[in-house]
């Protein structure tokens, strides 16, 4: 018995926002779109997902009624060429929960947890894309060799559309932005 390993046609051609919006949720799961091209993301580990959920739960509680924090959904950075990213955690305006697609003007914070294979994308590419689209705050979470989470906080300089370093936390987050929040992230993860 042979298995057909031919990739679907849509993996080799640019897609438009309209084409993407016609796809089912199942088709959109586990992918991002960069300059119209589909980028398949490997499934996250349970540790990665747990860390994202802990961050999202704490940010959601700290954000009050005006802000939601959730995981695993598209943020539309641009329509042409289509660029959607799926930050690990997104803090967004609560009154935009039913607006689709979520756009940068709805987002207060995007967070990425760096995993093996995503280092350059999370440290350089997404940092630049999120800043260029105007997302005010970026959190990049990395694990030390001992498995302790380090949270790097970046704030947008709106004039240059570049992030500047703000705060760095190891293990225990006591952030002042986007709002005061304390998150205990003991390791190892």
Regions inferred by a protein language model and the residue ranges of each:
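Gly/Pro/Ser/Thr-rich low-complexity, intrinsically disordered segments predominantly at protein N-termini
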Residues: 1-189
């Amino acid at each position: 018995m042979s298995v057909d390993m031919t990739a679907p046609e849509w993996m080799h051609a640019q897609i438009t926002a309209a084409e993407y919006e016609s796809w089912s949720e199942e088709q959109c799961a586990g992918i991002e779109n960069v300059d119209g091209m589909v980028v398949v993301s490997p499934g996250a580990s349970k540790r990665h997902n747990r860390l994202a959920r802990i961050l999202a739960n704490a940010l959601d509680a700290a954000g009050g009624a005006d802000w939601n924090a959730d995981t695993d959904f598209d943020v539309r950075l641009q329509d042409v060429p289509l660029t959607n990213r799926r930050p690990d955690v997104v803090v967004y305006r609560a009154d935009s929960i039913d607006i689709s697609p979520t756009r940068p003007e709805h987002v207060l914070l995007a967070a990425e947890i760096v995993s093996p294979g995503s280092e350059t994308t999370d440290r350089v590419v997404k940092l630049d894309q999120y800043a260029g689209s105007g997302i005010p705050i970026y959190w990049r979470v990395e694990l030390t060799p001992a498995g302790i989470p380090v949270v790097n906080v970046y704030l947008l300089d709106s004039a240059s559309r570049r992030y500047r370093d703000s705060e760095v936390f190891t293990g225990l987050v006591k952030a002042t932005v986007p709002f005061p929040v304390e998150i205990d992230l003991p390791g190892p993860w």
